[in-house]
Amino acid sequence: LADMKKRRIWLWQGDPLGSAFFDASGLSPVPLPITEVYTSLSTGLIDTTIAPPLGAIALQWFTQTPYMTDIPIMDGIGGLIVSRRFFDTLPPDLQALLRRTGEAAGKRLISETRRDNAKSLAVLKQHGVTFTTEWKDKESDIFGLRDRAAAVLAREDYIPADIYDQARKALEAYRARKTGK
């Protein structure tokens, strides 16, 4: 983290999740719209970005950042959300269809994203990007920051506190089952 405090890190302007993470870490990011990142890397206004491998390639940011780490801090989250009131008006066969196709599409998206990430990492390596792994010695610190940022978002009611608590309990139960504790 001390090394990161020396960096000029891009934060997607208006991103409350990123802001909470940086607040929890004590880092001071440079908020910019995504359209200004490449130019800002080129001019030195920023020297560090957070992006998935495919994004770093598509936006050509990797040409300005010769080092990359694989810290798992960025998740893509999405979904088709409909109100319970609307969903309940659908006939049972359409409800089942929506659930079945949604689950299949979600699994396919995860599989394709993982495949694209693996391909993108190979492309980045071919272009001379150096991958660092020092963070793995401090993995618990990184995840502790994530947890503190989530708690801040719950306190600020960005994430409803009751939903945050339910999610934390479900995660703890999952981890306990997975480790057998």
Language model: regions and residue ranges:
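N-terminal secretory/targeting leader peptides
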Residues: L1-K181
